[in-house]
Curated annotation (Swiss-Prot):
Membrane topology type: Single-pass membrane protein
Cytoplasmic side: 1-6
Self-association state and partner proteins as the record states: Interacts with the outer membrane lipoprotein YnbE.
Location of the protein in the cell: Cell inner membrane
Keywords, comma-separated and alphabetical: Cell inner membrane, Cell membrane, Lipid transport, Membrane, Transmembrane, Transmembrane helix, Transport
This protein's name: Probable phospholipid transport protein YdbH
Positions of transmembrane segments: 7-29
NCBIfam families: PRK10695.1
Superkingdom as given in the UniProt entry: Bacteria
Coarse class of the protein's main subcellular location: membrane
Gene: ydbH
Organism taxonomic ancestry: Bacteria, Pseudomonadati, Pseudomonadota, Gammaproteobacteria, Enterobacterales
Pfam families per record: YdbH-like
InterPro entries: YdbH
Length: 879
């Protein structure tokens, strides 16, 4: 009896312990048991054992593998049955690359075949997946919700880039919402439609109708798409609402063996470059899956520009597109034309690799060429891009990159540029691209040839220009010739394109030989050195200095912010004598003394143009020439330049002070002030004021000259010495003494006059003495005038009055009335001399033969006064 109790107790313990043991070891035996029903070569793995709670079955982690490839990874799954089956899953990750590794198995005869049979097997179930991830398309992840019954199956998917809501009732599929964000910063593509599914779910819907609305990037108009099909054929039409011609028209047919798009048409009228063409695609054996389908087709592109029409054709296939190893040959041939530019292409290539990471390899003979006109004045004779061996992947471009450019500009000249480099998985800010470049050309306007050469690389986010040398054999413009100017790198230019710590730095040097001027001036060899330091080429600081021999250095610094250039320039104080090489030797001018310094602030921007302001100062300047000297020159130039106009004298007038000018006559204490706008306007005139010169024992004054001029500027002559004037001119025919004054109304923009109604008059007694030889010669040559000439051998002038007019052609008109007393051989007589003279002053100024002209006039116009006064008496002239 005791043995029976023991047996019963052992059986009870076995009944209790075996289920508990199985439950505690689910992670060990469930994968093995499930492998009986899984496809051959696949398995499941549990990193944590499932557990059963009051709420249901919890599976913390489950992986489904095809060989060593993880097809699915499920975490935080729970299965319960409140009113129907409820499956909640935290995350499901699917790797599309593993689908190609699933083994091919024959369908079981007992398996359901029709859609209705499959639907009848569905239990009443809710399935919620918080995060469904498709690799390698992680950006399309979202939340999936399913509500399943045998009558209706509902699906809802919510992601950042895609939203879907639809239901399947029998064979009728209704899509009530499909929103896809196809382009960044653009509204989503929206689609709704109804479809009839086939009786056996082994193909596409047997009929359907769908409409979609989308926005094209950078285009304001909406686009409508409509898809219709019935049985084995259909059509997709895409229309822009503001354009009657379809953007896409694809009629298609499908059979169990082949999918065909025949005579498809497309057009793209946007971006100022209209495109259109035809499309044909054939997919054989499509039902066998992507791995076994054979794809081929043809895409034509028609372009039109000022150079005519262009046609290019892309042929692809036959080949396959595979999730593992695609093999699809491609070839693009033909030409494209836009405006005056023509692009020629012959690009054989091979598309290989997986669809998740494809590789496009250009084959031998791949060449891209172009010619035509890019801008109005630049003609591209030919540009060539050999592409053989170049590979393009998601990681970037790999291979040798070359370019050869031949071009000319009708006025500037022609040039040839070469570029050769090696790319290694290069994309902007990723990978590496090393290059070198060289070239040469002509610069016709300055009768020069130039060359350029350099090296650099783009490695990840860093662009480095390691070598640069470019220059001209000469620059010849007008009267100037610059010998061998050349720009080189003193320090590599490095641009770090890092979002957190960007930088841009480098240093350059512009060196030139002598600058020669046809007049004989020579600027010594010059050097401009400058450096940049900043964030990127649109925001940096710069500084530098310019010097030529002993001239300079002129120091410059500033900044560029991508819109506005700001800076300052300083010319330190230095002797005026350093500019001696700039003085032509023919001038025989010797710069003896003086100091010069200047300071300028400047800015430049597209809207405001170039602006500058500052001042320049010359102190104690002195220059000597064989015939004259200029000493004590002080010049102060405050200025501002904006909107194409100079504003002179911003905080005070432009001032000129010259201590003395020694020439035929000596001028001292020369002063002048200038203030205003140039070019001048009525609202902002230009004023020349306080002009004063001490000369000929008196002075010349002008209070104000206003431009634009409405009134003449009055040039006053005060007590000028006629004897000093005659001594300076040094005529041999006569001599004068005494002072004279006058006023000359000066016009600069009058239609006719330079001086109108000017006058001269004696300020006191004056004397006129004719040279004896001159008087004797006149008497000898003209007996009639001889007696009158004798009265002018010596004359004391008591009153003189001269009216002066000068027109803008240079014609000087003088009308003089002179009254005086002649004293000859102890006799005296009153002389009344009326003098009228016309001569082109420009010609007279060139000849400077005033004395000879006066002698000729005296011969023709001298006359005896009336002899009504007894001999030996002083008589007054009758009025």
């Amino acid at each position: 009896m005791l043995g029976k109790y023991k047996a019963v107790l052992a059986l009870l313990l076995l009944i209790i312990l075996v289920p508990l043991t199985l439950l505690m070891t689910l992670g060990l035996w469930v994968p093995t048991l499930a492998g009986i029903w899984l496809p051959l070569g696949t398995r499941i793995a549990l990193d944590e054992s499932p557990r059963i709670t009051r709420k249901g079955l919890i599976i913390p982690d489950l992986r489904y593998l095809v060989g060593d490839c993880q097809l699915a990874h499920i975490t935080n799954a729970s299965l319960s049955h409140p009113s129907r089956w409820l499956l909640n899953v935290g995350t499901v990750e699917l790797d599309s690359a593993c689908l190609a590794k699933l083994p091919q198995t024959e369908q079981s005869p007992a398996a359901p075949k029709t859609l209705a049979q499959w639907q009848a097997m569905l239990p009443n179930t809710w399935i919620n997946i918080d995060k469904l991830i498709f690799s390698p398309w992680q950006e399309w992840q979202g939340k999936l919700s399913l509500a399943l019954t045998s009558d209706i199956q509902q699906l809802r998917y919510q992601g950042e880039k895609v939203k879907f809501q639809g239901q399947l009732k029998g064979q009728q599929l209704t899509v009530s919402e499909l929103d896809v964000v196809a382009f960044e910063n653009q509204p989503p593509v929206k689609l709704v439609g109804e479809f009839a599914m086939p009786l056996v779910p082994d193909g596409l819907p047997v009929s359907g109708h769908a409409t979609a609305t989308l926005n094209l990037p950078q285009e304001p108009s909406l686009v409508d798409a409509e898809l219709d099909w019935q049985e084995n054929s259909g059509q997709l039409i895409v229309l822009a609402r503001d354009n009657g011609d379809p953007l896409l028209d694809l009629p298609w047919q499908i059979t169990r063996q082949q999918l065909t798009v025949s005579d498809g048409r497309w057009s793209w009228p946007y971006a100022g470059f209209p495109l259109s063409g035809r499309l044909g695609v054939k997919v054989d054996n499509w039902q066998a899956g992507l791995e076994n389908a054979l794809v081929s087709g043809r895409l034509s592109v028609l372009t039109q520009g000022q150079a005519g029409k262009g046609n290019a054709v892309l042929n692809f296939g036959p080949g396959k597109l595979s999730m593992d190893n695609s093999q699809l040959p491609l070839q693009l041939t033909g030409e494209a034309k836009q405006a005056d530019l023509i692009l020629y292409a012959r690009l054989p290539a091979q598309l290989s690799g997986s669809l998740s990471d494809p590789t496009l390899t250009f084959e031998p003979g791949a060449l891209l060429r172009s010619k035509g006109r890019v801008i109005d004045s630049l003609d591209i004779d030919e540009i060539r891009w050999p592409l053989a061996g170049v590979k393009v992947t998601q990681r970037g471009v790999d291979g040798r990159l070359q370019a050869i450019l031949q071009a000319h500009e009708n006025e500037l000249g022609d040039f040839v540029l070469h570029m050769d480099g090696l790319a290694n998985d290069f994309l902007p800010d990723a990978g590496r691209w090393q290059w070198r470049y060289w070239g040469k050309g002509s610069f016709t306007p300055m009768n020069a040839t130039w060359d350029v050469a350099g090296k650099g690389e783009w490695h990840d986010s860093t662009i480095t220009l390691t070598d640069l040398s470019t220059g001209f054999d000469q620059l010849q413009y007008g009267t100037m010739t610059v010998e061998k100017p050349r720009l080189i790198l003193d320090k590599p230019i490095v641009w770090v394109r890092d979002a957190q710590h960007p930088s841009f730095s480098g240093a350059l040097s512009l060196d030139a030989g002598q600058t020669l001027f046809t007049g004989g001036s020579v600027l010594p060899p010059s050097t401009l050195k400058f450096s940049v330091d900043g964030r990127d080429p649109t925001y940096f600081l710069f500084k530098g200095d310019l010097h030529a021999g002993e001239i300079g250095p002129v120091r410059v610094n500033g900044r560029w912010d991508g819109i506005r250039l700001r800076g300052n320039a300083w010319w330190p104080k230095q002797s005026l004598t350093v500019f001696q090489p700039l003085v032509p030797p023919d001038w025989k001018m010797n710069l003896r003394d003086g100091e010069l310094y200047a300071q300028v602030a400047f800015s430049a921007a597209p809207e405001q143009g170039f602006r500058a302001g500052g001042h320049g100062v010359l102190k104690g300047g002195s220059a000597w020439m064989p015939d004259n000297q200029v000493n004590g020159v002080d010049f102060v130039l405050p200025f501002r330049f904006a909107d194409g106009a100079w504003h002179l004298g911003t905080r005070g007038p432009v001032t000129l002070r010259i201590a003395e000018v020694i020439n035929l006559v000596t001028a001292k204490n020369i002063t002048a002030d200038l203030q205003g706008r140039y070019p001048w306007t009525e609202e902002e005139p230009l004023l020349l004021t306080d002009v004063s010169v001490d000369v000929l024992g008196g002075n010349v004054l002008m209070k104000q000259l206003r431009m634009p001029q409405h009134d003449p500027a009055l040039l006053r002559l005060n007590n000028l010495s006629s004897s000093e004037l005659v001594s300076a001119v040094n005529p041999k025919q006569f001599a004068m003494s005494g002072a004279f004054s006058g006023a000359l109304p000066l016009w600069l923009n009058n239609e006719k006059w330079i001086v109108k109604d000017g006058w001269l008059a004696n300020s006191g007694p004056m004397t006129l003495r004719l040279d004896k030889d001159t008087a004797d010669a006149v008497v000898k040559d003209n007996m009639t005038a001889g007696s009158a000439i004798n009265w002018l051998r010596y004359m004391e002038i008591s009153r003189s009055s001269t009216k002066i007019n000068l027109d803008n052609l240079g014609l000087l008109t003088m009308q003089a009335n002179i009254t005086g007393t002649s004293r000859v051989d102890g006799k005296s007589g009153t002389v009344n001399l009326n003098y009228h003279h016309e001569e082109n002053i420009f010609t007279l100024w060139r000849s400077l033969r005033f004395g000879d002209n006066l002698q000729a006039w005296l011969e023709q116009n001298a006359r005896l006064p009336g002899n009504d006064c007894p001999q030996g008496k002083e008589c007054e002239e009758k009025q």
